[in-house]
């Protein structure tokens, strides 16, 4: 694990740079106060069971395999850095990767639901990404749905397809489905006056797709590169987690 000890400060340093250099901007996370209170509360209720189960899973993981703590921190830092990158969007807001695919492959979707939510909380507090009232909605899309999509792809394809392709699809589609859900959340809260939910969903989805599809592809490629590096430098830990069991490089 020595190489990871060298990488983790780099990832954390990049995160700190983003924190201190970030400027006010609207992010693809749903911003503070944007959702009506009823919907904001609804998404907290929906995501709460995942947090409870995820915390239990993390406690068992750390108790049984304390050597994985560094990888947990690395996965969280990776998600923080990627999801904090802001790229201008056609709406005057910004788009960003999600970074949840890697942690999901390593630890599963329940663990990532907690890590991703912690990332979102820190972003809301430190760099004005998202918000506290919209944390439930943002956590459901980025920290729950995205990771579960990545997990289904990983579990379904890792024994049937080249591992690089499986990692790419897991990361890229987790990113895309995050914004499909975000579009649905916004459409539910603000249906079109004429076309209702469907028209509003199509409008939000079309806006997000302009920047999010290229970002998802880029995130998939980057996640493959990082995963390959982990295979080379942390193979024992990956085997201990069951990540490489039955997978062919």
Curated annotation (Swiss-Prot):
One CC-aspect GO term: ATP-binding cassette (ABC) transporter complex
Primary subcellular site in the record, as a coarse category: membrane
Keywords: Cell membrane, Cobalamin biosynthesis, Cobalt, Cobalt transport, Ion transport, Membrane, Signal, Transmembrane, Transmembrane helix, Transport
Subcellular location: Cell membrane
Membrane topology label: Multi-pass membrane protein
Gene3D superfamilies named among the record's database cross-references: 1.10.1760.20
Transmembrane segments: 33-53, 70-90, 102-122, 134-154, 161-181, 207-227
HAMAP family cross-referenced by the UniProt entry: CbiM (MF_01462)
Protein name: Cobalt transport protein CbiM
Organism per entry: Roseiflexus sp. (strain RS-1)
